[in-house]
């Protein structure tokens, strides 16, 4: 795809580096397919006349799942007596062409390899200059600013912090990201000097994108770990029209592992439906939702040392965001993208305290809810 207009590029060459002549060329819709790729990690190089060569490093290839990629190419416009083209890797260059400085692309493959990262883009960003992370949560302080002033965006729309148990132990941070690496594509992170399209942020910006599903083959993934169960599925809705779906559901297993009710319980669901058309552009329906529950209990009276030891309660967080996005190519150099979305967040905390005579007294009940309807449109 052209990185600025998102127009498909025909006859671009895509090859697997260091594997002989294994490669392919794109068709009129910019699609390509490479079979018989060796299992492991590979580097993919894409080139076309008039465009800078693009290289994606360390792409994991397994025997159980196809790799679906969207590769943007930057147009190379120069008037020179001699043209020498050399491939160049720029991980510090964001996907947004309007970002001159202060931005960096976050690869979900990088997030998966980051030590103690939990596949979390926020924890990955703590490795960048000017960003300080926290050991217990994914809160990040960017250039000394509070984590609560960090903005999260999904598919171009500002959303509530998509983190499980956000703001429970500290403002701006949480336990685990609800954005699974199974569905999130390459995204942008800004630690300053935001492009003019961004606002309402004093610290940093995470501009996340949900990738399109595989429009040729059905694929399903099941993962089981200490933190939870992860189910993912993607595939074509119509192979003829190129439409696809992708979804991911996670359910916590922490309470099952320990057998008590004091543990954190969470669920999250994210999805995207993509419907390209011949003349009306591309329509996408996307959404994300998460449910968090925490129920602490008072400890034995003989072990009381602080007020918190004698308190019990129930904390609930509910968040959701979803929308409809339309992208239309006006000509070879211009496209318009419009989105209509809604966001919702609700939290409630109830606290009870055990008295000296073993009576449970209600001491607090905090409720907060917020919803927004957002419409944006821009011409590029």
Regions found by a protein language model. Give the residues of each.
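Outer-membrane beta-barrel translocator domains and adjoining extracellular loop/strand segments
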Residues: 257-262, 290, 295-304, 325, ...
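Transmembrane beta-barrel wall of Gram-negative outer-membrane proteins
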Residues: 225-251, 261-293, 313-342
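Periplasmic N-terminal accessory/gating domains of Gram-negative outer-membrane beta-barrel systems
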Residues: 52, 58-63, 68, 84-194, ...
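Extracellular loop and loop/strand-boundary signature of outer-membrane beta-barrel proteins
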Residues: 217-219, 257-261, 305-312, 321-325, ...
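Membrane-embedded beta-strand positions in outer-membrane beta-barrel channels/transporters
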Residues: 31, 68, 139, 186, ...
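Short sequence motifs at beta-strands and strand-loop junctions characteristic
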Residues: 133-134, 198, 223-225, 261-265, ...
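Periplasm-facing N-terminal accessory domains of Gram-negative outer-membrane beta-barrel systems
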Residues: 1-84, 88-90
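Short strand-turn segments of transmembrane beta-barrel domains in outer membranes
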Residues: 173-177, 185-195, 204-235, 245-264
